[in-house]
Curated annotation (Swiss-Prot):
Annotated S-S bridges: none
Domain of life: Bacteria
InterPro entries, per the entry: ATP-dep_Glu-Cys_Ligase-2 (IPR051680), CP_ATPgrasp_2 (IPR025841), GCS2 (IPR006336), Gln_synth/guanido_kin_cat_dom (IPR014746), YbdK (IPR011793)
Any single GO BP term: modified amino acid biosynthetic process
EC number(s) given by UniProt: 6.3.2.2
Transmembrane segments: none
Catalytic activity as recorded in UniProt: L-cysteine + L-glutamate + ATP = gamma-L-glutamyl-L-cysteine + ADP + phosphate + H(+)
One Gene Ontology term of the molecular function aspect: ATP binding
Region annotation (Carboxylate-amine ligase) ranges: 1-372
Designated name of the protein: Putative glutamate--cysteine ligase 2-3
Top enzyme class: ligase
Entry annotated with the keyword Nucleotide-binding: yes
Length: 858
C-alpha cells in the first residue's frame, strides 16, 4: 500500500482584481505582478486576474499558512495601488468593455480562436494538485474520484452574480467554464497513453492548440506526476480551500488503495455526472445534490457527511480527520459563499456590499493557525483594536482585556477582525441581525411588554477555555446527580432531613414543594434537563449562582445565536476546533426518550408541551419541537383516558409517552384539557400509573429553591461521598437567626433575594441600592425571614458588548445545560447571558441578552 503520510498536495488560486473605490473589476493585474515574484504569482488569460501557486506539502496546516502568506503578499501589493484581490468564482460589478486579455501570444491566439467564449471568462477557480506515482495511476484515479466532484463544487460555490445580476445559480462560473469545448466531465481512459492520444487528436483537429487547454473537471497533469482538481470556484474563505484540498487528497488516496487492491471503479453514467455537476452549480450547499449511483436527490449537507465517512480511513491515516471534520462542520454551518453574498445584497440592495464581503473574506483572515484554535504570538498586544477599545475601561475582571489594557491571547484574532470591520460595519450587521431575527421569529417577551421583541444577541463572541469547560463538566454532572438524589429523597424517606443535612423547615416551607412531586416512581428521572447558572468572580474563577430544575430555557437561543452570528458576521464565524451545536436537539431527544415510563414498549412518543404563542419563550418551544421532529402541544389538546395520555389532533387520539413540559406545573395542572376538565388530577394519576412521564418532573421546584441552594455542597458529600468540584456563592439563610442577623447588619454590602423570586425579580443589590430600598427589604425580611437569603456580592466578570456604536464592559454569566439519561450529559452548548450596561442582572426576562459562546475541544 502507498505511504499515505507522504502524499503532497498543492493549490493554485485565481483572484479577481477590484478597484477598492468603485469595487469594479479592473485590468490591472500586470501592475501588481511587477511588484511580486514570478515563481509564486502569474498572469491569467484576462488582465484582471492574478494566479498564485503554493508549495506542495504533505501538511494541510503548512498549506494553509502558505496560502495565507500568498494572499497577504498579493493584498499588500494590490493595496499599494488602491486595488484588492477577490477570491470568488465571479464578481458582481464589471464592465466587459474595459477588460482585455493578457499580453501573451498564447492568450491572444485563444481569444482569436474562441472569440466570446474567451472574452467572457471573467471567472476564477481554485485548483488542487495531488501527487501520484505516475500518469497511468493518475488516469485510473480520475474515474474513482469523479462521482464526488459535484460535492466539492458545491462546497466552493461562490459565483451567484454575473454581469451585475443574480444568475440564479450558486456557481455561475461553472456554466461559463463549461463553454470551452474541452471542459466538464472527463471521458473514460484505461491508460495515460489513451488519454495522450485523445489530446493529440484534439490538437490535430484544431479545436485546441496545446494540452493545457484540456479543462476537464479532473485530469492528470501534462508535465507532473499529479492529478488535478479543476471543478471548483475560487473560495473567499481560505479554510474552504483547505477543506477541499484535504477531501480531494483523501479521495485520491482511497482510489489508489482500491486500485492497488485490484478494484474496478464503478462506472457512473456521464449523463448523470453532468446532471450532478449542473445541480451542484445551481444549488451549492443550500439545496439537494444528485446521488450518482442512486440517482435521487440528497441534501448537500447529508452528502457531505456521507463523503466524510467514505474517506475517513484515509483522513485518519493522513492525521487530517479532526481538522477536515471541523472544517466541514464549519462550512455546513456557514453555508456557501453564494448564500452569504446574496444575504449581503439583500440587506441594502447594493452590489458594492457583495464586493465588500468578498474582499473582506479574501483579505481578513487571522494569522496562520488562529482560526484553528491556536492563539498567534503578538509582539505588541496593546495595539490590538486601538479604535474599538479606545474608551473601553472595565472596572474589574474582564474576560477579554487584562488589567494592563492588553487583549488576552485567546481573543486577539476576534478583536482584530472586529477592528478591521469598524463601527459603521458593525452597526450595519447589528441591524441585519435584528432584521433576520424578526423574519425568523427569534423573539422573547420582556416582563412588562405586551409584545415579543427580537432576543438581544451581541456580536462579540465569548470564549470558554477548554480546560475550564472540562472542570465545569465534571462539577455540573456531579451537582445534578446530587440534586437528583435530593429530589427523590425529599419525596421519599427524607433521610437528609433525618440526618441533619437539611433543616426540616427548609423542606417543609419551600415554595416549590408539591404534593404531586410524589407521583413519579422511585426509578423515574426527575431532572431530565437542568440549566445551571455560573459566574466568574474577580479572580476569574467560576462559581455556581443558581440551579434551574423546572423549565430551564435558553438552549434554543444558544443554537440560534450561533446561526445568526455565522449569517450576519461570517468574518467572525467560530473557527475549527470549537464544539458544534448541531447535536443539541438529538441529545435532548435522547434524554426525553430515556425519561419514558417503564410501561412503554418500542420507541416512546415524545411531545413538547407549551402554553402557546403568548409564552415568552414560545420560539424556543417551537424550534426544539421542529428540530427533534416531535409535535408541539398545548394543554387544550391533551386528553388523559384510563391513565393514558393522548394528544388530540383533528379529532384523532395519538398516545404520548413523554411530555417535555415547558409550562409552569401549576398552570399546567389548572389548565383544561381536550375534555374541558383540569388536567392536573388525571395527568398525575397517569404519572403514578407509569403510563406517562412529565419532564421535568412535578415538584422539582424545591430543588432550585434559593434556600436549598445553600445546602447543595452538603448534599454532594452526603449523597455521593465526594467533595464538590465547584464552589457556590457564600450564602446566608435568613431562616437561621444567626445568619439573619448577619444579613440585616450588612444589607448595604450583600445581595438579598426572595426565595420564590424568578428571573431576577425582587433582587436587591446592596451596594447599588437606594436607602429606601434597603429599608423596605429590611422590613420584608423581619416580617418573614424564611422567605429571604443574603449572598456575598460577586464582582461579575465583564465582556465587551456592542452598545450604541461602541464597546461597553457588561456583566456576563453562563448558563450550562445538563441532560440526564442514564448519566448526566453536559450539552456542548452554553448560553452566555449579558446584562444591559450598568446592570448586574443578566436575566432575559429583565432585558438581558446573550452572546455566541465558543467552547474549544480539548
Amino acid at each position: 500500500m502507498s505511504d499515505a503520510r507522504n502524499v503532497a498536495v498543492g493549490v493554485e488560486e485565481e483572484f479577481h482584481i477590484l478597484d477598492l473605490t468603485t469595487r469594479q473589476l479592473v485590468p490591472r493585474a500586470e501592475e501588481i505582478l511587477q511588484r511580486l515574484d514570478k515563481d509564486s504569482f502569474s498572469p491569467e488569460l484576462l488582465k484582471s486576474v492574478v494566479e498564485t501557486n503554493s508549495q506542495p506539502t504533505v501538511d494541510l496546516l503548512a498549506l494553509r499558512s502558505n496560502l495565507l502568506d500568498l494572499r497577504r503578499r498579493l493584498a499588500e501589493a494590490a493595496g499599494e495601488l488602491g486595488l484588492g484581490p477577490a477570491a470568488s468564482g465571479t464578481v458582481p460589478i464589471l464592465d466587459m468593455d474595459l477588460l482585455d486579455v493578457s499580453r501573451d501570444a498564447r492568450y491572444e491566439q485563444m481569444t482569436e480562436d474562441y472569440q466570446i467564449v474567451a472574452r467572457e471568462q471573467l471567472i476564477c477557480g481554485a485548483q488542487v494538485h495531488v501527487d501520484v506515482a505516475d500518469r497511468d495511476l493518475a488516469m485510473a484515479v480520475v474515474a474513482w474520484t469523479a462521482p464526488w466532484l459535484p460535492m466539492l463544487l458545491a462546497l466552493s460555490a461562490s459565483s451567484p452574480y454575473w454581469l451585475g445580476a443574480d444568475s440564479g445559480y450558486a456557481s455561475m462560473r461553472t456554466l461559463v467554464w463549461q463553454r470551452w469545448p474541452t471542459a466538464g466531465v472527463a471521458g473514460s481512459f484505461q491508460t495515460a497513453a489513451e488519454y495522450d492520444q485523445l489530446i493529440a487528436d484534439l490538437i490535430k483537429s484544431g479545436v485546441i492548440s496545446d494540452p493545457g487547454m484540456v479543462y476537464f473537471d479532473v485530469r492528470p497533469s501534462a508535465h507532473l506526476p499529479t492529478v488535478e482538481l479543476r471543478i471548483c470556484d475560487a473560495c473567499p474563505d481560505v479554510d474552504n480551500v483547505i477543506l477541499i484540498a484535504g477531501l480531494f487528497r483523501a479521495l485520491v488516496g482511497r482510489a489508489i488503495e482500491e486500485i492497488e487492491a485490484g478494484g474496478q471503479a464503478p462506472p457512473p453514467r456521464a449523463e448523470l455526472l453532468r446532471a450532478a455537476t449542473w445541480r451542484a452549480a445551481r444549488s451549492g450547499l443550500e439545496g439537494d445534490l444528485v446521488d450518482i449511483f442512486g440517482a435521487g436527490p440528497v441534501p448537500a449537507r447529508a452528502m457531505l457527511r456521507r463523503m466524510l465517512e467514505e474517506v475517513r480511513p484515509q483522513l485518519e491515516r493522513y492525521d487530517d480527520w479532526e481538522l477536515i471534520d471541523n472544517l466541514a462542520e464549519q462550512a455546513a454551518g456557514r453555508g456557501s459563499s453564494a448564500l452569504r453574498q446574496r444575504r449581503a445584497f439583500a440587506r441594502r440592495g447594493l452590489l458594492t456590499d457583495v464586493a465588500d464581503l468578498i474582499l473582506a473574506e479574501t483579505r481578513d483572515v487571522p494569522p496562520a493557525g488562529a482560526s484553528l484554535g491556536v492563539a498567534p504570538a503578538v509582539s505588541a498586544p496593546d495595539q490590538i483594536a486601538p479604535i474599538l477599545l479606545e474608551r473601553y475601561q472595565p472596572a474589574g475582571y474582564d474576560e477579554v482585556v487584562d488589567e494592563h489594557g492588553a487583549v488576552r491571547p485567546q481573543y486577539r484574532a476576534v478583536m482584530r477582525t472586529l477592528e478591521r470591520l469598524g463601527p459603521d460595519t458593525l452597526d450595519e450587521r447589528v441591524g441585519a441581525r435584528e432584521a433576520e431575527q424578526t423574519d425568523r421569529g427569534i423573539t422573547f417577551r420582556v416582563n412588562g411588554d405586551s409584545a415579543s421583541r427580537p432576543f438581544p444577541f451581541d456580536i462579540v463572541p465569548r470564549i470558554v477555555a477548554a480546560d475550564d469547560w472540562a472542570v465545569l463538566g465534571r462539577g455540573l454532572g456531579q451537582r445534578v446527580r446530587a440534586l437528583e438524589a435530593f429530589l427523590h429523597d425529599v419525596y421519599g424517606e427524607r433521610a437528609a432531613v433525618a440526618d441533619g443535612i437539611v433543616p426540616p423547615w427548609v423542606v417543609n416551607d419551600a415554595p416549590g414543594l408539591r404534593h404531586g412531586g410524589r407521583a413519579p416512581g422511585r426509578d423515574a428521572i426527575r431532572i431530565t434537563t437542568a440549566g445551571i447558572d455560573l459566574v466568574r468572580g474577580g479572580d476569574g474563577g467560576w462559581l455556581v449562582l443558581e440551579d434551574n430544575l423546572r423549565v430551564p430555557s435558553g438552549i434554543a437561543y444558544a443554537v440560534e445565536g450561533r446561526r445568526l452570528a455565522e449569517s450576519v458576521l461570517p468574518e467572525l464565524g467560530p473557527p475549527p476546533g470549537i464544539l458544534r451545536l448541531g447535536t443539541v436537539p438529538a441529545l435532548l431527544h435522547d434524554a426525553l426518550v430515556a425519561a419514558a415510563p417503564p410501561a412503554v414498549t418500542g420507541e416512546p412518543a415524545v411531545a413538547v408541551l407549551t402554553s402557546g404563542p403568548a409564552d415568552s419563550a414560545y420560539f424556543e418551544h417551537a424550534m426544539l419541537a421542529e428540530e427533534m421532529g416531535v409535535p408541539l402541544v398545548e394543554p387544550g389538546a391533551l386528553l388523559v383516558d384510563d391513565d393514558v395520555a393522548y394528544r388530540v389532533d383533528d379529532g384523532r387520539r395519538r398516545r404520548v409517552d413523554v411530555l417535555y413540559r415547558r409550562i409552569d406545573e401549576d398552570e399546567l395542572f389548572a389548565a383544561p384539557g381536550a375534555d374541558g376538565a383540569p388536567l392536573g388530577p388525571a395527568l398525575l394519576r397517569a404519572v403514578r400509573a407509569g403510563q406517562v412521564s412529565v419532564a421535568n418532573a412535578p415538584g422539582n421546584g424545591i430543588g432550585d429553591d434559593k434556600v436549598v441552594y445553600a445546602y447543595v455542597p452538603r448534599m454532594v458529600t452526603y449523597y455521593l461521598g465526594e467533595q464538590p468540584v465547584l464552589d457556590d456563592v457564600p450564602t446566608y439563610v435568613c431562616g437561621d437567626p444567626e445568619q439573619c442577623e448577619h444579613v440585616l447588619a450588612n444589607l448595604d454590602q450583600l445581595v438579598v433575594k426572595p426565595v420564590d423570586g424568578f428571573g431576577g425579580s425582587g433582587v436587591v443589590i446592596g451596594p447599588h441600592a437606594e436607602p429606601y430600598q434597603l429599608t423596605a427589604v429590611r422590613e420584608q425580611i423581619l416580617a418573614d425571614p424564611r422567605r429571604w437569603i443574603g449572598q456575598e456580592v460577586v464582582a461579575l466578570s465583564t465582556h465587551p458588548t456592542w452598545h450604541d456604536s461602541h464597546l461597553e464592559p457588561c456583566a456576563v454569566d453562563l448558563r450550562v445545560f445538563v441532560y440526564a439519561g442514564v448519566e448526566p450529559v453536559v450539552v456542548p452548548a452554553a448560553l452566555s447571558r449579558v446584562a444591559p450596561p450598568g446592570s448586574l442582572i443578566v436575566n432575559s426576562s429583565q432585558g438581558g441578552g446573550s452572546k455566541d459562546t465558543w467552547i474549544p475541544r480539548r
